[in-house]
Amino acid sequence: MKNTRNEPLRFAVLTDTHVSPARAAVVEQLGRTYAALAEMAPDFVLHCGDITDTGLPREYDLYQQAIPAALRGRIRHVPGNHDVRWDPTAKELYQARLGAARYSFDAAGVHFIGFDPTQPLLEPGHCGRDGLRWLDRDLARLDPGTPVIMYHHFPAGPGHGYIDDQDALLDLLARHGVRALFAGHIHQETVTRLGLLTQVTLTAFADGPSCYWAETDRAADGRPELAVSRLALTADGTRERHLVARVPLSGSSPDSGPRRPRRRARASGWRLRLTGSVQGGIAAAGSTAIAVSTAGQVVALRPEDGEVRWQARLGPAYRRAAFDGAGRTVFVPSADRHVYALDAGTGRIRWRFDAGAPVLSAPLVAAGDRDEHVVFGAGRQLFAVAAGTGRLAWSVPGRGWSAGRACSDGRRVYTCAADGYARAHDLRTGQEAWSYRMVTGDEHRVALYSGWDCVVALGAGTVIVATVCGSQALDAATGAVRWSFPDSAMYPPAVVLGDGTALLTSEQGTVSRVALAGGEVIWQARLGVRLQKAGPVVAGDRAWVVSEAGTLTSVRLADGHLSGSRQLTRARCFCAPAVADGTLIAGDQDGYVHGIRLT
């Protein structure tokens, strides 16, 4: 690799290969493209993510088999959302196959940064304070005037909302004078000038073989620049270049006009900031609420004013904790491969269970005839451990993974998984009672469209499960389908109301109250906002719905009348809320826990 400023730099860039067994033609063409690039002898190749289509081990196998020997060790990767969203290892597999997800290196006087704003289990990106601090430190150590080229998966700037905290990212890049940003994700070629920064988004390789060639050059005034061209590799071996952009690597910024002012949420109630993002959901019992963060912070709060009663530091948590029936122990799932049992009054660890894989599902505390069990998924295994001791009661290996949560009626446990099945297991032994196939197709399709993130609901002998495409009500005794519903209640979970009805909330923002017996719609309310994992929580005669955009809306249970909408936060919300002591508690991607008095 060239390491002096006097030598021209030549490298290739591509993105969105979406390798999978179902895309044999793409894999074959990728091998030919990499072979052709090897003949052109670039200094290195950059890949802007969505390397695989689902993050499956077989997809990484196929991708790595397409790389010729001449390019091995010379391709620099960053992950895309398709590489991590359906990955039960929380990026462990990616790092084992392709190395670090964020890093930097120098070549020919240019500093390159591979950045990673992707998040396990989610589509959007989020840099977070930790990511921005890492980036700031990396840039701060450079000599003044060093050209910087960054590449990651999501585009940023006007018209793009793929990164939660893109304003903070763009401010940082502007402050350090970063010159170029390569991105993918949108499968389109665009060139955008943002002050000193030139952002180039690339067409997707999977949509038709395409890659890009970049060379350092000199502008007419002698200043250094980067010439970026689309590279066409024809069947007869011809290589054609079509200029896309010339990126200045020095000079001052053109006037980009006034910056949009930062929006701030309206102050209301209380809020507390944790490290990392709060996206796992809030757990509440009595007068204690538990918030967990992706940085591993666990905080016990007093609902009425947000006073911190205790806090602990564990591994990253992406799903909500759970209390035992007495409210004395709280169980925290962690991507560090453990479930922790903490004393709810002090935060002291009572026991920890090593699941052998990241615990990305929410634990369920299921009360049987004699004992309570903590039921959760880790990797492709379902576990039940004794709530009091943490000893393994039973496990079911060889099933699909899950980021959702099971439910139980005290006799059985009902689950959904990424292998496309809903199942019932005996709570005492783990023996399977029935299974229902929710999705058919190859491994890739099942992984994408299964109930991998379903929070199973139960009421009146009816089990409500959901895939990306719709919801089904199953007979709890037999697994037979009682009725189906066209809207998916997977991301915003279904809520059983206890009177023979349930709330089914779609990702598109429609709340439906339905009869559990036959699925008849009692009323529907359209919120006009997108919902994800946050969804509704019931308090008294109302459901309170937190949207992805941070709005809070009241829905009257009697008739679906909407009222009381307010902006809870300007950050994105994927955190399931809870209500305790008349206070609604929710978390956001910026790490804030918000408390709003409802009475």
Which role does the model predict for each range below?
Residues 302-305, 343-346, 386-389, 426-430, ...:
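Short loop/turn segments that connect beta-strands within beta-propeller blades
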Residues 263-283, 310-324, 351-367, 379, ...:
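Extracytoplasmic beta-rich repeat domains
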Residues 32, 190, 195-264:
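Binuclear metal-dependent phosphoesterase catalytic core
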Residues 568-599:
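Blade-level signature of beta-propeller repeat domains, shared across WD40, Kelch, NHL, RCC1
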Residues 24, 49-68, 85-96, 125, ...:
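Metal-dependent catalytic neighborhoods of phosphoester/phosphodiester hydrolases
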Residues 4, 35-44, 69, 123-198:
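His/acidic metal-ligating clusters that form di-metal
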Residues 1-62, 137:
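N-terminal active-site segment of His-dependent metallophosphoesterases
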